[in-house]
């Protein structure tokens, strides 16, 4: 369900702000993106573990914009750079799609599923929850995986390399992050 379909209650906004302060995320995570992610997380009934992953596409690919939170322990577990789809933009992702062959990233809320060993190594299947926004993620083979072009040393050239639409992580972080967020 798109977050914009339901007005966010004032109590939920206050809870998001309190959580942001409690987790000491100022200067690390964009407050508006965090608040929106928490509101969506709280509406997802099917989740099976207290892990929230946020990709803040308002930031450039050269900055840490992939965040993993333990919502029970109220901790930031990981922060990393992450690649976006090659047709979503250069350093900033500005264009998004749910269409197969678009090579663009998709917005919205997902549930993580199981892992597999594929062409990009250890990978995590994503199930898009928002009709018309990201519900074709599986059909498009949009998965979380590691990639050499997503390593911070590549960012020194002005941007990370780009994927075919997948959120690609630095190779060294991919497996521990995937193991933390899978089956959620």
Role assignments for model-derived ranges:
Residues 2-164, 172-184:
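Cell wall/extracellular polymer interaction/catalysis modules
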């Amino acid at each position: 369900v798109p977050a914009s379909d339901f007005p966010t209650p004032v109590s939920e906004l206050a809870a998001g702000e309190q959580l942001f302060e409690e987790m000491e995320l100022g200067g690390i995570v964009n407050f508006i993106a965090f608040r929106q992610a928490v509101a969506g997380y709280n509406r997802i009934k099917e989740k099976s573990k207290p892990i929230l992953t946020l990709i803040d596409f308002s930031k450039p690919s050269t900055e840490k914009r992939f965040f993993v939170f333990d919502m029970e322990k109220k901790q930031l577990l990981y922060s990393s750079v992450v690649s976006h789809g090659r047709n979503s933009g250069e350093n900033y992702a500005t264009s998004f799609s749910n269409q197969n062959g678009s090579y663009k990233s998709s917005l919205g809320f997902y549930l993580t599923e199981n892992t597999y060993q594929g062409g990009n190594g250890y990978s995590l299947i994503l199930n898009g929850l928002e009709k018309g926004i990201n519900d074709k993620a599986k059909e498009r083979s949009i998965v979380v995986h590691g990639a050499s072009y997503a390593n911070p040393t590549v960012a020194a050239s002005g941007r990370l390399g780009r994927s075919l639409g997948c959120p690609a992580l630095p190779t060294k972080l991919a497996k521990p992050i995937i193991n933390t967020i899978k089956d959620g």
